């Protein structure tokens, strides 16, 4: 007898009511995509659960992949046995004996299939007695056991587990539409992308690159961050915008204290064009209320004016230390702090407006035509597709 399955439990997906099926189907697709390189592994779903059939594979590498799949609340290595009292006894004893350091245990039986003749409470007592009779130096503790042997009796078979691994929860990536992440290369925006994915959002990303003021290493840093994010979702397209000429024009032609605000508005205009082309429904940013000049309520109000797209700001109420802790936990922090400039850290005004007025911005913009340079910028966009294994180049065509 061996552990031959991984039992997957849903989180808030179980509360989705009539449309739960579409969430479960998407979760199954995402799981299959993450573990497709393991030969013979199969993913099956049943009422309220999903199972991965190991088919001779070691469970640990597969578990490491599954722990980062949004939509999974928890998982357990499981033994599958026939729905007979003797088989269930044997499986429960095997599961308990695998926990060599346990001094106390409890048994929890859940009888999903009422075709099984013994009620759950009675089966609890039968199994508890059997385990006590066939082990040494271990006692029952129903309140704080070292190990809980869980038995799920289903129509097709019984599944027995002896431990639970907490996962990331959330919703399966792809169930909440697609969003364009403004990815700078700093600490905040990758965390914003991660948190958006946790709510089921499928990401594409846009990066504003200003060579020679920003280097090729700065661009590669963004691609590396994107590759880290693919561990938690699907492949991600990154749209790299050649921003130098437009950025220089903004800082040359606009009042210095309003240049940062106008630059952000241009970023949103370009991002909106990509959203239209790629059928993306929203923008996601790493903005955090009150952190820097462009992230005051007044600045957001003025910058938002140029787009009708919803703007998702997952970090809006987090403090910097909280954001740093998440970035460390998800593996983006060390890349984010590499000392390469991005377009938002060059040409920084001495005293940027923290309370920019819409009417002033519109007045300044109306006195200079940025359209030719903006169209040239859009035509020069490069797109790369990032997976968790490779970087694939492709040209960005037909944007206009």
UniProtKB/Swiss-Prot annotation:
It catalyses: [ThiI sulfur-carrier protein]-S-sulfanyl-L-cysteine + a uridine in tRNA + 2 reduced [2Fe-2S]-[ferredoxin] + ATP + H(+) = [ThiI sulfur-carrier protein]-L-cysteine + a 4-thiouridine in tRNA + 2 oxidized [2Fe-2S]-[ferredoxin] + AMP + diphosphate; [ThiS sulfur-carrier protein]-C-terminal Gly-Gly-AMP + S-sulfanyl-L-cysteinyl-[cysteine desulfurase] + AH2 = [ThiS sulfur-carrier protein]-C-terminal-Gly-aminoethanethioate + L-cysteinyl-[cysteine desulfurase] + A + AMP + 2 H(+). InterPro entries: Rossmann-like_a/b/a_fold (IPR014729), ThiI_AANH (IPR020536), ThiI_fer (IPR054173), ThiI_N (IPR049961), THUMP_dom (IPR004114), THUMP_ThiI (IPR049962), tRNA_STrfase (IPR003720), tRNA_sulfurtransferase_ThiI (IPR050102). CDD domains: PPase_ThiI, THUMP_ThiI. It comes from the Bacteria. Keywords: ATP-binding, Cytoplasm, Nucleotide-binding, RNA-binding, Thiamine biosynthesis, Transferase, tRNA-binding. ATP binds at residues 182-183, 207-208, 264, 286, 295. PROSITE patterns: THUMP. GO terms for molecular function: ATP binding; CCA tRNA nucleotidyltransferase activity; tRNA binding; tRNA-uracil-4 sulfurtransferase activity. Pathway: Cofactor biosynthesis; thiamine diphosphate biosynthesis. The keyword Hydrolase does not apply. Residues 60-164 form the THUMP domain. It is found in: Cytoplasm. PANTHER family: TRNA SULFURTRANSFERASE. Belongs to the ThiI family. HAMAP family: ThiI (MF_00021). Catalyzes the ATP-dependent transfer of a sulfur to tRNA to produce 4-thiouridine in position 8 of tRNAs, which functions as a near-UV photosensor. Also catalyzes the transfer of sulfur to the sulfur carrier protein ThiS, forming ThiS-thiocarboxylate. This is a step in the synthesis of thiazole, in the thiamine biosynthesis pathway. The sulfur is donated as persulfide by IscS. This is Probable tRNA sulfurtransferase. It comes from Oceanobacillus iheyensis (strain DSM 14371 / CIP 107618 / JCM 11309 / KCTC 3954 / HTE831). The gene is thiI.
